[in-house]
C-alpha cells in the first residue's frame, strides 16, 4: 500500500517534466524560423507574435510552461510543501503571469502603449520576479539544493538586468537596446531552475 501511494504521489512529476520539454519546441522553432526577421538581442520573445504563426506557437509555449509549472507545484505539495505557503503563491503568480501575458499580447515596437500592452508588461514583471524568489525559498526552507539556489540567484539578477534594460527603450539614445538578450538568458535560467526543482523533488521522493 505504501508503495502504491508513493507512486501516485510522484505520478504528476513526470508529466510536469514532459510539459516543460514540450514547451521548448515551439519557441525554439520560432527562433530558427525568424532568423533575419527579428533580432534576438533587441527584440523580446513576445515580439514573435508578429511573425507567421508566431501568436499560436508562442501561446503553446507559454500555456504549456504554465501548466507544467502548476504540475510541478502539485508535486511539491505532495512532497510536503505547505499548500498555502509563499512558495505556492509565487509559483501560482508565475503561472498566472504567463497566462495573462498570453491573453494580453504586447504592442509592436515603437507603437504607443495600449491597454493590452500595459497588462502584458505588468504580467511579465510579476512572473519574472515570482519564480526566482520561489526557487530561492524552496532551496532555503524546503529542499536544500545548491543547484536550485544558484539558478534562483542567477535568474533573480538577470531579471533585474532585464528590467533595467528597458530604460534604453523608454528613453531612446540612452544606451544599446539589449533587452531581448537579457530576456533570453533569463528564460534559459528559469527553465534550468524548473528542471532543477523537478530533479530535487524526485531525489526527495526516492529517498523518502
Residue ranges and their predicted role:
Residues 206-208:
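Short, highly charged, low-complexity non-transmembrane loops/tails of multi-pass membrane proteins
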Residues 3-204:
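Hydrophobic, aromatic-enriched alpha-helical segments typical of multi-pass transmembrane helices
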Amino acid at each position: 500500500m505504501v508503495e502504491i501511494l508513493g507512486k501516485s504521489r510522484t505520478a504528476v512529476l513526470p508529466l510536469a517534466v514532459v510539459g516543460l520539454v514540450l514547451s521548448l519546441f515551439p519557441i525554439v522553432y520560432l527562433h530558427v524560423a525568424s532568423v533575419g526577421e527579428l533580432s534576438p538581442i533587441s527584440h523580446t520573445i513576445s515580439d514573435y507574435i508578429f511573425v507567421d504563426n508566431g501568436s499560436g506557437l508562442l501561446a503553446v509555449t507559454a500555456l504549456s510552461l504554465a501548466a507544467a509549472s502548476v504540475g510541478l507545484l502539485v508535486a511539491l505539495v505532495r512532497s510536503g510543501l505547505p499548500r498555502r505557503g509563499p512558495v505556492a503563491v509565487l509559483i501560482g503568480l508565475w503561472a498566472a503571469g504567463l497566462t495573462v501575458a498570453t491573453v494580453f499580447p504586447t504592442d509592436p515596437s515603437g507603437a504607443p502603449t495600449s491597454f493590452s500592452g500595459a497588462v502584458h508588461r505588468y504580467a511579465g514583471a510579476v512572473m519574472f520576479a515570482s519564480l526566482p524568489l520561489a526557487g530561492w525559498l524552496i532551496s532555503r526552507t524546503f529542499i536544500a539544493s545548491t543547484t536550485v539556489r544558484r539558478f534562483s540567484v542567477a535568474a533573480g539578477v538577470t531579471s533585474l538586468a532585464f528590467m533595467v534594460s528597458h530604460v534604453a527603450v523608454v528613453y531612446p539614445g540612452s544606451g544599446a537596446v539589449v533587452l531581448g538578450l537579457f530576456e533570453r538568458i533569463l528564460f534559459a535560467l528559469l527553465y534550468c531552475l524548473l528542471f532543477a526543482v523537478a530533479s530535487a523533488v524526485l531525489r526527495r521522493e526516492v529517498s523518502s
